[in-house]
């Protein structure tokens, strides 16, 4: 019983210390599909997404998701990603960038910029279901530390406003802000550029039939039915 309770507490702590896992993966996947086609061929989107949840899932890191502690982790894993990419080790480059993205994007989350926030509200804020819409940008990031520091600006006010209004536009805005930083960091890390062509896979409703095929199927069934009747009658006549 004690072990089960401990496991439950660990899972709860992890969820309270970052955007939920689908959001982390959605952000890094969005980056991938907005890089140029050459870079997409080199990188592994599955490993990017896996890396994006490793700080929670594998490291069980529940203390370095906010600035300034998020900066060293982001820098370490970005450097590892860049080094691996330059060595043409594209799988580790993908994984490491995914890890870096986790620390970067969490820095933008309002609950990570306040203290003693109610756990229930923290979880609700970061469980927002949203597909980020920020567009790819190739601005040069000169100072990651400064960029992450700026990411914290206005976040306490965001939190207070959200607590009072539960306005979903606030966490959505912060996810887009984090994506706006991820784009240029990915471009610099992988010596890439923004993709002018859209290659992202979208879910398209699929019909297993159309009008013509349905009519054809009905005709076939009708012919088979008539054929069966004819054969039965033929057998009776022989008898």
Which functions belong to the PLM regions below?
Residues 12-95, 113-207, 218-222:
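N-terminal, motif-rich segments that launch catalysis or mediate targeting to/interaction with membranes
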Residues 2-11:
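Sec-dependent signal peptide recognition
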Residues 234-239:
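Cytoplasmic C-terminal tails of single-pass
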Residues 207-231:
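Selective detector of the "anchor" transmembrane alpha-helix that sits immediately C-terminal
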């Amino acid at each position: 019983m004690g072990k089960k309770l401990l496991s439950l507490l660990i899972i709860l702590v992890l969820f309270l210390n970052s955007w939920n896992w689908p959001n982390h993966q959605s952000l890094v996947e969005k980056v991938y599909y907005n890089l140029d086609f050459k870079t997409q061929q080199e990188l592994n989107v599955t490993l990017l997404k896996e890396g994006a949840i490793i700080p929670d899932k594998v490291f069980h890191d529940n203390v370095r998701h906010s600035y300034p502690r998020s900066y060293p982790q982001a820098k370490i894993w970005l450097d590892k990603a860049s080094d691996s990419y330059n060595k043409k080790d594209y799988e580790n480059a993908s994984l490491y960038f995914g890890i870096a993205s986790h620390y970067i994007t969490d820095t933008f989350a309002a609950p990570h910029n306040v203290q003693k926030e109610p756990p229930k509200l923290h979880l609700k804020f970061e469980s927002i279901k949203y597909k980020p819409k920020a567009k790819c940008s190739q601005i040069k990031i000169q100072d990651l530390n400064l960029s992450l520091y700026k990411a914290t600006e206005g976040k306490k006010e965001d939190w207070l406003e959200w607590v009072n209004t539960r306005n979903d536009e606030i966490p959505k805005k912060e996810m887009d802000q984090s994506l706006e930083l991820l784009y240029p960091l990915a471009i610099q890390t992988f010596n890439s550029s923004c993709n002018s062509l859209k290659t992202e896979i979208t879910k398209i409703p699929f019909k297993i039939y159309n009008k013509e095929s349905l009519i054809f199927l009905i005709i076939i069934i009708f012919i088979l039915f008539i054929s069966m009747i004819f054969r039965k009658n033929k057998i009776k006549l022989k008898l």
